[in-house]
Structures are given as structure tokens and as C-alpha cells.
Regions:
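HAD-like aspartate-dependent phosphatase fold
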Residues: 1-22, 26-201
Length: 201
């Protein structure tokens, strides 16, 4: 048996666990990609486990659980992994007392706070790391503070590298990678670490 690209996929029948990206693979925005209807029901019926992954750091797990179930994809909180998980797990283990200035949505900030990490809000408070996430609430003031901290020598990290986020109708909106490029242009510096797919953290 071969796939669309002519590659042998017969070995898939022996796999017990599958990992799937969400945005652009299972769905585009609030629309299921054609051909995905009933696919996960078949996986479950075959006794296979699966996890759904996303680099989108602007939301929390429950958002994706609700969204996927609403699209007919049966999933629980335990089956959803977001790039914020990689970031908070790493920082909780390696920099538990660090201070983080976050470019991100209120939900990303909540996810970070729920992990027990400390955030700062102003230039005067300083930071040990600037965190660049998928910030749909980005303002010039937040961007300026981030760049000034970075210019002062504060390293910055990113929750994921995606430049564009796919949405309904085959369109795209700017994602974290685009914000990284903006900061690189303004400061001349690259992130010290990037989390999320395809990176190892």
C-alpha cells in the first residue's frame, strides 16, 4: 500500500501510537480538512492511541479539546500537547526562579503562571528571559519593552518557529516566526532557544 506520494505505508498497520499536527493537517481554523471525517473513530476502533499537537501558544488545552470535539475529533485533555508545554516544562526544570517578560496572549500568560513561573510587566522590573509567543494582542509598547530588554543583554526564547498560521479559506495570518524576524531586525539578535515542533525541547 502506498500513500499519495508513492511511499510505502504498509508498516503503519503495526504502529500503536500516532502523533498528529492540528492546524493545517486536521483543520483549517474552524473547518475540518476534507477526508478527516471519521478518521479518528477508525483509529479508536482499531485500538490505536493518538495525540494531537499544535505550535499555537495563544490558547490553552481546553480550547483545543472543545474545538476538536466540536469538529468531530474525539479527544481529551490528556491527548493534547501545545508548544507552551515544552516551554514551561523546560523552564520549570532549568530556571524555576527565573523572571519572564512575555509577548503573548493573556491565555499564554495564564499557562505560564499556572506552571509556577514568574512574569514581569515593565522594563524597570527587568527579566531573565524575554518570551516570544503567538501574540494576537501585540502592541508597540510591549514590543518596545521586549526589544529594549534584549538590547540590554536579556536573552529571548520563542514558543515555536512558525512564521504563518493557517486559517479558513486557505489564508494565513502572521505567527511567532514573523515576530522573531521583526525582533531580529530591530535588535540584530536571534532567539537563544526555540520550542515546539520541530525542535527537541
Amino acid at each position: 500500500m502506498k500513500d499519495y506520494y508513492g511511499k510505502d505505508i504498509s508498516t503503519l498497520k503495526n504502529k500503536k501510537l500516532f502523533l498528529f499536527d492540528m492546524d493545517g493537517t486536521i483543520n483549517l481554523g474552524n473547518e475540518l480538512i476534507p477526508g478527516m471525517e471519521g478518521f479518528f473513530d477508525k483509529l479508536k476502533a482499531a485500538g490505536r492511541e493518538y495525540y494531537l499537537l499544535t505550535n499555537n501558544s495563544s490558547r490553552d488545552h481546553q480550547h483545543y479539546v472543545n474545538k476538536m470535539n466540536g469538529l468531530g475529533v474525539p479527544v481529551t485533555r490528556e491527548n493534547v500537547l501545545i508548544s507552551t508545554d515544552a516551554f514551561t516544562n523546560y523552564m520549570s526544570k532549568n530556571h524555576p526562579d527565573g523572571k519572564f517578560y512575555v509577548l503573548g496572549t493573556p491565555q499564554l500568560e495564564k499557562n505560564i503562571a499556572d506552571a509556577g513561573l514568574t512574569m514581569t510587566k515593565t522594563l524597570e522590573e527587568g527579566a531573565d528571559f524575554v518570551v516570544v509567543g503567538f501574540d494576537q494582542t501585540l502592541t508597540y509598547e510591549k514590543l518596545t519593552t521586549a526589544c529594549r530588554l534584549i538590547d540590554k543583554g536579556v536573552p529571548y526564547v520563542a514558543t515555536h518557529p512558525d512564521v504563518r498560521c493557517p486559517i479558513e479559506g486557505g489564508e494565513f495570518i502572521p505567527d511567532t516566526g514573523a515576530m522573531i524576524e521583526l525582533i531580529k531586525t530591530a535588535t540584530g539578535k536571534s532567539p537563544s532557544m526555540i520550542f515546539g515542533k520541530p525542535f527537541q525541547y
